Design a protein with these regions (language model features):
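Catalytic cores of alpha/beta
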Residues: 13-15, 68-79, 137-148, 189-204, ...
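Active-site mouth loops of central-metabolism enzymes
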Residues: 2-10, 59-75, 96, 128-138
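Glycine/small-residue-rich loop that forms an oxyanion/phosphate-binding "nest" at active or ligand-binding sites
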Residues: 47, 53-107
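Active-site-adjacent beta->alpha loops and helix N-cap segments on the catalytic face
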Residues: 13, 32-51, 71, 97-115, ...
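C-terminal alpha-helical cap/extension of soluble enzyme domains
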Residues: 180-262, 266-269
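Alpha-helix-loop-beta-strand connector modules within alpha/beta enzyme cores
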Residues: 36-62, 104-129, 167-190, 232-255
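Hydrophobic faces of well-ordered beta-strands that scaffold small-molecule active sites
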Residues: 3-7, 26-28, 55-59, 91-93, ...
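Glycine-rich phosphate-binding active-site loops on the catalytic face of alpha/beta enzymes
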Residues: 27-36, 82, 86-98, 151-163, ...
């Protein structure tokens, strides 16, 4: 597959929209409005059954930073095993030390739990380092830590608020990663900027949610009793827009002939 389009979803409705739009794979989480947390087993199993797409499940026990205590780390290892047993094709996680380095010692048992569960099931599992990478101290040291951990993917914006702003670092990361470690470009990715991002970075994998805000089906609405984030309406729901994903997939597909032409010219030389 010359290019990969991964869509981040937190509901079955969003997963189905991503599938209809042409997503190659899904990252599944809960609570995308706060950056995502670990999804339930029921949601994972439902999404797998309804879409048939490869699904990588997020491991994040809470909102906030990526420096976890021993109870949270134990939860993450247990969740890794259970999610893979329930059908997850991969796990997506990250842990940092207080000093801002990738916490290899903390991550090893989490990835080991996922791999052991996959081995018992007789299938492979993909392991991704998520955007904890974007707030680490040294991105190239973090890349080498990911390589040492045997990871397949790093999800990153190039340590910037959005991928277009991080394009220069993303290009360097793609070059440093080589063919065996996928740099998955995420944050601020749109159908409109995908071709330019691909050209500027050399990346082959892109991540977006493609979300829209839907109005709740509730007709009775008691205002002034917040149940979640202050300032965020209880009646505004995030959901992936199949049309956005379709345009993103089309943008990537349009690059394939250009890539093939470049490869043919290179071979002829």
């Amino acid at each position: 597959m010359p290019y990969t389009l991964e869509v981040c979803v937190d509901s079955t409705a969003s997963a189905l929209a991503a599938m209809r739009g042409g997503a190659h794979r899904l990252e599944l989480c809960a609570d995308l409005v706060i950056g995502g947390t670990t999804p339930s087993l029921a949601l994972l199993q439902q999404v797998k059954a309804e879409t048939g797409l490869p699904v990588r499940a997020l491991l994040r026990p809470r909102f906030g930073d990526f420096c976890y205590d021993r109870w949270e780390l134990a939860q993450m290892a247990q969740s890794a095993a259970r999610l893979v047993e329930a059908g997850a094709d991969g796990i997506v996680t990250g842990v940092l030390t207080p000093e801002g380095d990738v916490d290899v010692e903390a991550l090893q048992p989490i990835y080991a739990a996922a791999r052991a569960a996959a081995q018992r099931a007789g299938r492979p599992v993909a392991c991704t380092l998520h955007r904890a990478f974007d707030v680490c101290r040294d991105p190239f040291a973090a890349l080498e830590a990911a390589r040492a951990l045997g990871l397949s993917t790093i999800l990153t914006s190039g340590q910037a608020p959005s991928a277009p702003e991080g394009a220069a670092l993303l290009k360097r990361l793609v070059e440093a990663a080589g063919p065996e470690l996928e740099i998955l470009v995420g944050a601020g990715v749109t159908p409109e900027n995908l071709p330019a991002l691909a050209a500027a970075t050399g990346a082959r994998a892109f991540h977006l949610s493609g979300k829209r805000v839907l109005d709740s089906r509730m007709t009775f609405r008691r205002e002034g009793v917040p149940m979640g984030l202050p300032g965020f309406s209880e009646f505004a729901l995030w959901q992936t827009d199949a049309g956005v994903i379709r345009r993103a997939r089309s943008a990537l597909d349009s690059l394939v002939p250009l890539l093939s032409s470049w490869q043919n010219n290179f071979i002829r030389r």
